[in-house]
UniProtKB/Swiss-Prot annotation:
GN (gene name): truD
UniProt KW keywords: Isomerase, tRNA processing
Documented EC number(s): 5.4.99.27
Superkingdom of source: Archaea
Family, similarity comment: Belongs to the pseudouridine synthase TruD family.
Name of the featured protein: Probable tRNA pseudouridine synthase D
InterPro entries: PsdUridine_synth_cat_dom_sf, PsdUridine_synth_TruD, PsdUridine_synth_TruD_insert, TruD_catalytic
Catalytic residues in the record: 97 (nucleophile)
Job of this protein: Could be responsible for synthesis of pseudouridine from uracil-13 in transfer RNAs.
Length: 413
């Protein structure tokens, strides 16, 4: 095990499980370097080259989509508009990477006779189905990733060999928080703490190197209290900042100004805070021992049920995603997790005391990353990796073990 750099620690990822030297290298140098193919619950791969599905009589249409450098949510909205249906009638099994080539299924309620032309998008097939696409319909994703311009190929190979047998922590990856401006979890934590001043500081007074000049200037103005000037300076794509500033400029108190931000965005912040807390829990659990060896007091998943570990019970170690309705581990594991909550200043009851629409319920997540069909090939200074991950797990968590980036943004993360 090796200590992670400050950037990772700020996201709750305190460790690498591999004790190898940093390989360096760049991911996503082009979208074709990061290929994501959805794997359905029955094991069928929705391959870039096409897939055959068995149609069923019903009220939905499943569409095979291959997108390149296209945001999933924006694609769904555009498709809904083109087909004349509500965005609520368009669904996916999971959000795919934008800076990638991604092959997956989108479902639309009703029959679809023709599909629009959308730049960066190919439609390869359509099937009538008796149900919509949803997270329960997919197992996960198959990844084919090329790591370019590797500085130390020997370090990459050593790390990848170690990963074949290592119990890799199932952290929430960089993209959950952002690499240019990693503050979503800080905004969520401020909401949980009911601290509007902390929220304001995270949104406007934390300014990062790789932000655009316009964004930096606007944040500086906002941080100084020049709300109207900041509102005029922020480009229109900064929806949440502009919504917050608009109310501040109108004289709202800070908490009610925050509530002017669209609810779905505020919910993303709370979920990011839950993800950050999970990462910290996982780091604390790593300090107590390997993730594939349950300890007394651990929670384990056995046959789809979560129970406290007992000798001979077996199962996979799980940790709580903090929120209402979850159990905490017992013993020294539970003590370590409660210590994290105290350090972060988050009351376990805070998740239920949120305003309507923001109440956060907890869940359980496997501590160990479940990696399938793992292989790699070295081609000069490039390394190609192939593997399958269950939905909700992040490919970048595996890649960081080899690259070990001090500044993830510079490596394409």
């Amino acid at each position: 095990m090796r200590e992670a750099p400050p950037f990772d620690k700020a996201l709750g990822m305190y460790y690498y499980v591999t004790d190898t030297c940093p390989s360096g290298g760049v991911i996503k140098k082009s979208p074709e370097d990061f290929v994501v193919e959805e794997v359905l619950a029955d094991g069928t791969v929705v391959a870039v080259g096409g897939v055959e599905l068995r149609p069923r009589v019903g009220g939905w249409t499943w569409i095979h989509v291959v997108k390149r450098n296209v945001d999933t949510i924006r694609l769904m909205i555009r498709l809904a508009k083109a087909l004349g249906v509500s965005p609520r009638e368009v669904s996916v099994g999971g959000i795919k990477d934008t800076r990638a080539v991604a092959s997956h299924i989108i479902s639309v309620r009703g029959a679809v006779k023709g599909l629009p032309e959308i730049p960066g998008v190919k439609f390869l097939g359509m099937w009538s189905m008796d149900r919509p696409m949803s997270p329960s319909e997919i197992y996960g994703n198959r990844f084919t990733i090329v790591l370019r311009d590797v500085e130390r190929v020997d370090c990459a190979v050593e790390a990848l060999e170690a990963l074949k047998s290592a119990a890799v922590p199932n952290y929430y990856g960089y993209q959950r928080f952002g690499t240019i401006r990693p503050v979503s979890h800080l905004l969520g934590r401020a909401l949980l703490r009911k601290s509007p001043e902390e929220f304001f500081d995270a949104m406007f007074c934390k300014i990062f190197e790789h932000e655009s000049a316009a964004a930096k200037k606007a944040r500086e103005l906002a941080c100084r209290g020049e709300y109207q000037k900041a509102l005029e300076t922020f480009p229109r794509r900064f929806v949440e900042e502009r919504a917050f500033l608009r109310r501040l400029a109108q004289g709202y108190d800070m908490w009610n100004a925050i509530m002017g931000i669209p609810l779905q965005i505020l919910r993303i912040y709370v979920e990011a805070a839950q993800s950050y807390l999970f990462n910290r829990f996982l780091s604390a659990r790593l300090e107590l021992g390997p993730l594939d060896k349950p300890l007394e007091g651990d929670l384990v998943e056995v046959g789809g049920q979560v129970a406290y570990y007992a000798e001979g019970l077996g199962g996979d170690v799980v940790l709580p995603v903090a929120g209402a309705g979850v159990r905490m581990p017992r013993g020294k594991v539970g003590e370590a997790l409660l210590k994290v909550m105290k350090e972060e200043g988050v009351d376990p009851a805070a998740f239920l005391k949120m305003p309507r629409g923001l109440k956060a319920y907890g869940s359980y997540r496997r501590a160990r990353l479940e990696v399938g069909d793992f292989s790699y090939a070295v081609r000069g200074r490039d390394v190609e990796l192939r593997f399958v991950l269950p939905r909700g797990s992040y490919a970048t968590v595996l890649l960081r073990e080899a690259v070990k980036p001090a500044e993830p943004y510079r490596h394409g993360f």
